[in-house]
Amino acid sequence: MESRDIILRPVVTEATMATMDDKRYTFDVDVRATKTQVKHAIEDIFDVKVVKVNVMNLKGKKKRQGRYEGYTKKRRKAIVSLSADSKEIKLFNEE
């Protein structure tokens, strides 16, 4: 897998924005990606030094359309901790 295929999107919530001050960033990643692949992808894309990667698997939510039931797709979330001397990841364009 390519680095751009592993990292899908950043997760932007109040909780994740609060952890960005401590150089901890949260991303949605491919469900097949390992911690090592996530680490190499982040270092390759953003040119930073990753210290630790925590991942969590999220089940799909149950949804209904009339009498038919189904599930949304499952997700995998990665929390990436950067080293103290690495630069910040710019997620937003500040003009």
From Swiss-Prot:
The keyword Cytoplasm does not apply. Disulfide bonds: none annotated. It comes from the Bacteria. Pfam families: Ribosomal_L23 (PF00276). GO terms for cellular component: ribonucleoprotein complex; ribosome. GO terms for molecular function: rRNA binding; structural constituent of ribosome. GO terms for biological process: translation. InterPro entries: Nucleotide-bd_a/b_plait_sf, Ribosomal_uL23-like, Ribosomal_uL23/eL15/eS24_sf. Keywords: Ribonucleoprotein, Ribosomal protein, RNA-binding, rRNA-binding. Coiled coil: none annotated. One of the early assembly proteins it binds 23S rRNA. One of the proteins that surrounds the polypeptide exit tunnel on the outside of the ribosome. Forms the main docking site for trigger factor binding to the ribosome. HAMAP family: Ribosomal_uL23_B. NCBIfam families: PRK05738.2-4. Part of the 50S ribosomal subunit. Contacts protein L29, and trigger factor when it is bound to the ribosome. Belongs to the universal ribosomal protein uL23 family. This is Large ribosomal subunit protein uL23.
